A protein has these predicted regions:
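P/S/T/G-enriched low-complexity
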Residues: 1-194
Length: 194
């Protein structure tokens, strides 16, 4: 399908920012995103049935869920130093090249630190994720989380974000398929009950 093709064309850039993953997931379910959905419908990017979505949190006919998955742990998030990102050609360059790969192959190791700065640390990212997860649960959104071959530290972060301990799956290898089947089954049961 077109979606699978688009996803297949993505490539890993660098680092893990689970907090940003969650932030985007929540934004896409928030009613304030509705004007964007409307514009996408007007441009023919989404079907007309999506024009009035995301619906209000008060809508009792809708179950809002997020499935958050990682195979890593939050790490320090770095940004390219402004002096290397201040022209159109430089922005095009960085859209095509991952910073870590570029530095590894083109910049001597003792000079690399001058090319970037730390936006926030892994601990700050975990704190931001915790805040996002709490606010999301307060809105009644159900959070499922999957930690694929993660460390104990990452498992703890993912577990605390999930709506409950039973909404967290720590999996290895092919167990991931069973986790997704279980989540889908439970979501369908919730829909039938409500």
């Amino acid at each position: 399908t077109s979606l699978k093709s688009t996803i297949g064309n993505y490539s890993a850039r660098s680092n893990t920012a689970i907090n940003l993953e969650m932030k985007w997931g929540v934004a896409l379910l928030d009613p304030t995103f509705q004007p964007i959905t409307q514009k996408l419908k007007n441009k023919g990017k989404v079907e007309a049935t999506f024009a009035n979505r995301p619906v209000s949190y008060a809508n009792t006919n809708t179950l809002k869920t997020i499935l958050m998955m990682t195979d890593s742990v939050n790490v320090d998030t770095v940004r390219i130093a402004n002096r290397y990102y201040d022209s159109a050609s430089e922005r095009v360059h960085w859209n095509r090249n991952a910073l870590d790969r570029y530095l590894y192959y083109n910049v001597r190791s003792w000079q690399r630190y001058r090319w970037y700065y730390t936006k926030y640390t892994a601990n700050q990212a975990n704190s931001m994720l915790g805040s996002i997860c709490s606010a999301t649960k307060d809105k009644g959104i159900v959070i499922w989380s999957v930690g694929f071959e993660v460390t104990d530290a990452a498992a703890n972060v993912m577990r605390s974000c999930a709506s409950s301990p039973s909404h967290f799956f720590r999996v290895e290898g092919v167990e991931i398929s069973e986790a997704f089947k279980s989540i889908a089954s439970q979501i369908n049961q919730l829909r039938l009950i409500q």
